C-alpha cells in the first residue's frame, strides 16, 4: 500500500461465496485505513486471508463505505496499537497522537513511522485505534498539551521584503 495523501477510514464487510455446504457464510467486518476504496478492498483480502481460509477468488465484498468522524471539530487524543516489520523482525508498538479525526491521526502515524523507523506503509498493520481520555495518556509529547493555561511564545520574525530599501533610518521592529 502507498500511503499517499490523507488516508480515509473505510468499513469493509466481506464473506465467503455461498455454497451448497455453507449457504449462509459468516460476515467479516474490518476498519481499513486506505487512500481509496480500491486499496481498502485489497487490504481487506490481505488481512482476512491471514486470519481465515478466505481469499478474493472464493469470496465477495458485501459492503465497502467511508466512515465519517462524529465530531471533526474537537481535538482528541488517539492511541494507536500497531505492528510493523523492520529489517530485524516484527515489532508491536503503541503510539499516541493528537488530531481532529481518526484518519488524520492514522495518517500522522504512517508519516511518523516512516520518519523515525523507516517503516514503509505496506509493512505497517494498524490493529486498534481508540480515543483516549487525557488522564489515560502516557506519552509526555501528548501530555504537554493538556495544560488549560498553555502559552505559546510569539515568534521573533524578521521580515525580509525585497522591494523595501536595504538601508533605512529606523531599526526594524521584529517583536509582535
Swiss-Prot record:
**Any one Gene Ontology BP term:** cytoplasmic translation
Top-rank taxon: Eukaryota
Q: Where in the cell is it found?
A: Cytoplasm
Keywords per UniProt: Cytoplasm, Ribonucleoprotein, Ribosomal protein
Pfam families cross-referenced by the UniProt entry: Ribosomal_L18A
One CC-aspect GO term? cytosolic large ribosomal subunit
Kindly give the InterPro entries that the UniProt entry links to this protein.
Ribosomal_eL20, Ribosomal_eL20_dom, Ribosomal_eL20_eukaryotes
Q: Which GO terms describe its molecular function?
A: structural constituent of ribosome
The main location class comes to cytoplasm
Q: Which family does it belong to?
A: Belongs to the eukaryotic ribosomal protein eL20 family.
Spell out the subunit comment: Component of the large ribosomal subunit.
> What is the recorded function of this protein according to its Swiss-Prot or TrEMBL entry?
Component of the large ribosomal subunit. The ribosome is a large ribonucleoprotein complex responsible for the synthesis of proteins in the cell.
The molecule here is called Large ribosomal subunit protein eL20
**Species for this entry:** Danio rerio
